[in-house]
Amino acid sequence: MKCPYCGYIEDRVIDSRPTDEGSAIRRRRECSKCLKRFTTYEKVESLPIMVIKKDKSRQAFDREKLLNGILRACEKRPVSIEQLEKLVDDIESQIHNSLQREVTSKDIGEMVMAKLKNLDEVAYVRFASVYRQFKDINTFMDELRKLLNEK
């Protein structure tokens, strides 16, 4: 590792420990020339997940965009930000665990709806109305009937 102070290439690792719940390693190093210490982080490089949109264009998966869409559906509902963060974590893990590098926006929407249905039914209906693009009151009522019949 190149010393950030003098540029010398050789150093020694003084301390090494896991961070971020084991997803990275923090290493404390000492330069062999100037003896100054510095910290480096080692993390597994992951390939970005690409989302295939309805128009077939591709866009990098954006966790914040997903969270914001779910937040809108949960406005003025008794759902904590921690619950929403966990919901997004679960969806992100599900996508990564599928080992696919591409996922459709339709698949993501279905994952969100499945999780929201268990978390808050009003938020589920709000999200479904945007995601499924309800054209009129009848399609909205059909979704509500499905939800009631499942109970």
From Swiss-Prot:
GO terms (BP aspect): negative regulation of DNA-templated transcription
ZnF unnamed span: 3-34
Record carries keyword Metal-binding: yes
Domain ATP-cone: 49-139
Function: Negatively regulates transcription of bacterial ribonucleotide reductase nrd genes and operons by binding to NrdR-boxes.
Descriptive protein name: Transcriptional repressor NrdR
Similarity remark: Belongs to the NrdR family.
Keyword Plastid: no
Keywords (A to Z) from UniProt: ATP-binding, DNA-binding, Metal-binding, Nucleotide-binding, Repressor, Transcription, Transcription regulation, Zinc, Zinc-finger
Organism, scientific name: Acetivibrio thermocellus (strain ATCC 27405 / DSM 1237 / JCM 9322 / NBRC 103400 / NCIMB 10682 / NRRL B-4536 / VPI 7372) (Clostridium thermocellum)
